[in-house]
Amino acid sequence: MKTKADFFRMKQADEPIVMVTAYDFPSAKLVEQAGVDMILVGDSLGMVVLGYDSTIPVTVDDMIHHTKAVRRGAPNTFIVTDMPFMSYHASKEEALQNARRIMQQSGANAVKVEGADEVVETIAALTKAGVPVVAHLGLTPQSVGVLGGYKVQGKDAESAKKLLNDAKQCEQAGAIALVLECVPKQLGAAVARELTIPVIGIGAGAEVDGQVLVYHDLLGYGVNRVPKFVKQYAAIQETIVEALANYIADVKLRQFPEPAHTFTMKEEEWVALYGGKQS
């Protein structure tokens, strides 16, 4: 399993870090088999696998449940788990309690928190307690209501300057990495240059230290609209629908199961059961 030190080394060597967001055992197993460096168990599971219209309803229990499944599928991969909405905002004590639960019960290697300002103090408190923290800036899904929806952040000089300053504060507070979402590529490159910790982009251009995409998005598997920053490397959903349609047709036509998929009883046992040949 790669460690925090490995990710710092990769940044220094200009070796891109590959991260995938996964939510369950089978996807995590395939992600690890493919050789991904890091897995994110994101609270986006609320929309991708639980059918919510945002990340807001996701709970700490949800995150623990899904991270445990991911850990079973990827025992040798560094896992980062999102702290969901309002699990680290009310007080540092609550943040510590929820982070402790996630780290102790789920098998995560680090937690991720969104935002800056007061969240920087939370990052510092968690770090002091020995919890590795990944920060998340730019488009922060837990704050889409405040941000005015799913929009590119840091497009003007003033907001870009604030974001860069926020990133530095997160690093100073002890964050081990930064996820930077949906910002202009120039800003993504600048943040990566200015920080010593790895900057992992999602819609932040190619000049950051790594990339993260959601498993379902990059495989073309899911019902949600795919953002502009996603490149789909497969069209699994079409394959699945076609396979299901073929299964339905075979059952309706009694072409499934075939002999290869059925079990038989010895003729003498069948005779003993019915007292005569019935087959």
Swiss-Prot record:
SUPFAM superfamilies referenced in this protein's UniProt entry, alphabetically: Phosphoenolpyruvate/pyruvate domain
Recorded name of the encoding gene: panB
GO annotation terms (biological process): pantothenate biosynthetic process
NCBIfam families per UniProt: panB, PRK00311.1
GO molecular function ontology, one term from the record: magnesium ion binding
Protein name: 3-methyl-2-oxobutanoate hydroxymethyltransferase
Pathway per the UniProt entry: Cofactor biosynthesis; (R)-pantothenate biosynthesis; (R)-pantoate from 3-methyl-2-oxobutanoate: step 1/2
Cofactor(s) listed: Mg(2+)
